[in-house]
Structure formats: C-alpha cells, structure tokens
Amino acid sequence: MNKKFKKIVTEKKLTDAERIKENSNYLRGTITDDLKNEITNGFTGDNFSLIRFHGMYQQDDRDLRIERNEQKLEPRYAMMLRCRLPGGVIKAKKWLKIDYFASKYTLYGTIRLTNRQTFQFHGILKKNLKDVHKMLHSIGLDSLATANDVNRNVLCTSNPMESLIHQEAYEWARKISNFLLPHTKAYAEIWLDQKKIVTTEKEPILGKTYLPRKFKTTVVIPPYNDVDLYANDMNFVAITKNEKIIGFNILIGGGLSFIHGNKNTWPFLATEIGYISVENTLSIAKAIVTTQRDWGNRTDRANAKTRYTINNFGLNEFKKEIEKRANVNLKPVREYSFISRGDRFGWIKDINNNWSLTLFIQNGRIYDDNNKLFKSGLLKIANIHDGNFRITSNQNIIISEVSEKNKNKIEKIALSSGLINKSTNLRKNSMACVSFPTCPLAMAEAERMLSFFITQLENIMLKYGVEDEVIILRVSGCPNGCGRSLLAEIGLIGKSIGRYNLYIGGNRIGNRIPKIYKENITEQEILMHLKYLIKTWSNERKNKEDFGDFIVRKEFVKEVINPVYDFWS
C-alpha cells in the first residue's frame, strides 16, 4: 500500500456523505419520520441522501421550477425509483403490476428502461412510496442498492438464450448481486412494515459506512459487449468449454464520469488483472469490493471511485491485495474478443426451440401517444406471454421464450403498436440519459432532444450515401456518464442549456474513449461539424472503415491511450 497516499487521505477531513452513513443506523436515518411529515412532499436533511440506498432519488420537475417559485410553492417534489433486476430478466406476468403502478401512481404514467438493465418509475409522490415497494415485494422484486455507495444492479449479456452458457451467466449475475447486497434490515422495516428485531447489525462486506462511491459490476459472454464492460468497476468475462463456464477473466477499474474543467477527474477503461476458475468467483468479488471499501478515498468524492484508487496505489498493489484477501492467485488472462455491443433486433430461435423478439425502444421510454403505443402494446403482450421480458443494456427489451403458437400473436401486437418499426442503424445504436425535466444534475437536454437530432443526422448520412452504416451515438445531459457518451463514436455531453461538448473517436466495440473535438457548441454547430466529418469519412474511408476508426486514423483527434494524461491534453 502507498503509505504516503494513505497518510494524506487519513489526515484530510471525511466528506459529509461519510458522516451521513456513519450516523444513519445502517441506512435508517429518520426516513420514517419524513414519511409522516405532510408539510413537505420531499425528504429532509440526511434522508435526502439516505433514500438513495433504498433505490430512490428525490427529484422535481424543472420545467415547473420558475412557475412554482413565483407562486411561492416548493418545487414539485417526486421520487424516481429504480428496481433491482440483475441481468434484466423479469417474468412477463409481473409486468402487469409494473404497468398498473406506472399508470395509476406516477405523475408521468411512463416506464423508463435504463442502460443498466432495469426499469425506473419517475414521478412517485411521497405518499405512494410504500405502495410501490410493497407492489415490488409482491412480485419478488425490490429496489435495494440500486443507487448510492453500494454495488449497483449487476449487468449480464442479454442476448437471447442461444446456449446454456447464457442462463449460467445470468445465474452468476444474480448470485453476485445477492452476495454483495447490504445486510441491513432497514429496507424491510421502513417500506414493508416488517417488525424490527433487536440484534447487533453488521455489514460484513460493505461495512458500516458502505463503499466510498458507487460500484458497478458486469457478467459478460464474448463476443458481445452489450453491457459496455469497460465502463464498470468489476467485470467477469466468461471463459467456456463444452458449453459450460469454467472461469472468468477479471477486469477492474472502469468508469466514465468526470467534472467539467477538473483535470483530476477522467474516464478510464476497465483493465485486465487475470483469470480465475469459476469456484473462486464470489471470493474474488468480495476481495475486490472490500479492497475498494478500505482503500478508496473517503475525503474527496470526485476521486473516490475504483479507478482513482487503482491509480493512487498502483494496479500491481491493488492486484496483490485482491489475491491476498481472496487467497487466490490470479492466472494469465485467457483469450477472448468482442465483435459488437448492439442488440440484434427481430426474431431469434433459442436452444429450446422457442423464440425471442428484440424490440427497439428509443431511449428506453415506454409510453403511449398518437403515433406509438409502446406501453399498451407491451401490456397486451404481457397478458398472453408465458415467458420473460429481458431488458438490455441498450435500453431495449427482449420478449423471450416465446412458444411457436404465440409467435404470430405477439408479432401482430408488436406491429400494430409500433414496437416493430423501421429505424436506421444510427437510431438503433443511439442512447441518451433522462436529463430534463427530472434529473437535478442535467445541464442540457438529452432524451428529449435525441430523436430530433438523429433525424437531422440521418439526412446528412443519406446525402453522403452512408445511411445504412452504424455509428454509435450517445448523449449525456451532464458529465456524470449515465448515457455512456464517453464510449461512443460520437458523444455529446451537456455543458449548458442548448450547448454541448462534442467528443469523437470512440469505436464500435466500446474499448476506446473518444476525445473532445469542439467545446460548448450548439446543436446546429454540432451538426455542421458532423456534416463535414461524415462527408470526409464517406469519401476517404478504407475498406468499410468504421467512423470512429477513421476519425483516429485521420487524426481529427488524437487517440486516447492513457486518459489520466491525454484525456485533457
């Protein structure tokens, strides 16, 4: 361990987030008191932060802020709740209750699929919070540990069951998720009215003050990188033999968030540290998490994530500590490769001779309007489907395990409701975070602007004869990384209302960070620059060269090799 760094950290004052966790009585705080408080629709003091451990964020409608302020009213507070759903798999019949709650008890009446393979409700009033938790509990779900300083929802390759390996990987995602869950009974006591039992509580893995920052985990089946593993703290890449997982390559320390103008923050790709046999999976997971728990920076949240811990102590020191704690020697990484990270749309037959239908849901927003009946269409499918829904890391949904007798029925519903539609490859490979009006951190539009922006970019691609090509395009309303723009070939990151930084030069499979090309420019200025770049790409690329690879080869931006040094240079 770097003793100099340890001394510097321990001499600094801990962040207020650490005080909140220390004093929370294992995440209870005074949340129950706030639930009884009818004077405000929000949570007060430390509870504002503590509810995140229970899977909720307090938000308000930013479109209404000025109006409500003029009326001397508090902001229209409501909660966003994120379900814990390892691997994104949910029985179709459970969707019926999810749809009902969204329609009856949320302000917006929609369901949002996320790029972490789960769903969110936006606009839940405080008075309805217990109802949503009890509804989730009734169908075997919860929202524990989907936010704040814990291991978040565990991702898993979501392409349909083409082999037994897919089911095995999903089971590992579930095991890891359950293994790393908080042990506190606070969630059940507060939201499910379970009686408190007087015991001495402990958190054997996470500790009393939990982790220094959020922590993200994936289970991956090559050659598909649909989970964007390089953006995550801890990754298990399946190595198989005779249709069975025999072990995992381990990659650690990925993450994309940074702070505008703060050169001590930077994105970083997850790094290989070795291979383990499958029986060592949970012990290695525990070792990685507890090393980050103990070594992570609790004095500066901007430098508290795993990638900064590894940078501060060195990868070799971090690796040695993992091996020591797990009592496992990491072996050399086994060969693997990736060919894509997009979803494969349409029908695919699985190993049981059933079918899976992958549907494109732009930005993951499930709603009905005059042109799209996504919400009612999925509800109709859920009513007749005996299998699962699988939410993908690209914010889409798979109707899986469809029997031959139901295939035509489901296809007719999907067609009539617009769930099966003709979209360009550009649109199908795009993504945006939620941003306005509900995200308090948003600096610029993301979800609400993306569709219109893509339409203009589609026209440019059509003009230059590349309309059928794939370009990975992503938009984030701020630099926190939720839209994973910093693993895109074209990434927009909000700077202020109507203005973005334009990043280019990522690649198709998601293992190269793009670099800033233009700063603080408008949508029209972005389109002007992209028009020139796409025209040049169309005329000068070699052998069907991908857009991001062309950008780097022609040196429109320099390749980001070590982001610690060259992300900002």
From Swiss-Prot:
SUPFAM superfamilies: Nitrite and sulphite reductase 4Fe-4S domain-like, Nitrite/Sulfite reductase N-terminal domain-like. Binds 1 siroheme per subunit. Siroheme binds at residue 482. Its cofactor is siroheme; [4Fe-4S] cluster. This is Sulfite reductase [NADPH] hemoprotein beta-component. GO terms for cellular component: sulfite reductase complex (NADPH). Component of the sulfite reductase complex that catalyzes the 6-electron reduction of sulfite to sulfide. This is one of several activities required for the biosynthesis of L-cysteine from sulfate. GO terms for molecular function: 4 iron, 4 sulfur cluster binding; heme binding; metal ion binding; NADP binding; sulfite reductase (ferredoxin) activity; sulfite reductase (NADPH) activity. [4Fe-4S] cluster binds at residues 433, 439, 478, 482. It is an enzyme of class 1 (oxidoreductase). Its EC number is 1.8.1.2.
